[in-house]
Regions:
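Lumenal/extracellular ectodomains and adaptor appendage modules
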Residues: 1-155
């Protein structure tokens, strides 16, 4: 997930981000993932430092992933970039409020029970989001993403 403030001002200083990955593993090994980004604009409107936080977000997923559902404010595009599927959207978060955007998709591969699942999460410069990873309804990880990290867990 890549987030970009496109409105200017100093809104990044007042926003807090959380990114939740909810992974459902079906009996046949199919992986369905819902990725939700929540933006909380914590400061009042003042016309100079903070206003409506306008976010251009892009979700990069493995090539061949199938989009099942999206809950977004403004749909921008779907394309292939850097060997990944990319789904882009736009959201606006007024001062002293929060908004969420989500994408649900099926990954292009399957996993076997008992195997180890590896996930690389790359930190985007400029902010430290809260990362929450849920697998089959159980929260496995909850941390502030301060650097790139590879997570592993048993299926």
């Amino acid at each position: 997930m890549n987030n970009s403030n496109v409105a200017g001002l100093k809104g990044n200083f007042f926003t807090k981000f959380a990114i939740e990955q909810d992974i459902a593993i079906k009996d046949d090994g199919t992986l369905v993932k819902k990725v939700t980004t929540t933006i909380n604009n914590t400061f009042r409107y003042d016309g100079w430092l903070n206003a409506v936080y306008q976010n251009w977000l892009r979700l990069y997923v493995p090539e061949g992933s199938k989009l099942i559902e999206k809950n977004i404010e403004i749909d921008l595009e779907q394309k292939n970039e850097l060997g990944k599927e990319v789904w882009a959207a736009f959201s606006r978060t007024p001062p002293l409020s929060s908004t969420s955007s989500s994408f649900t998709y099926e990954l292009p591969f399957k996993v076997k029970k008992g195997s180890t699942y590896k996930m690389l999460i790359q930190k985007q410069g400029g902010y430290i989001p809260r990362m929450i990873i849920v697998v089959n309804g159980k929260k496995l990880f909850d941390f502030d993403l301060k650097k790139d990290i590879e997570l592993e867990f048993k299926i």
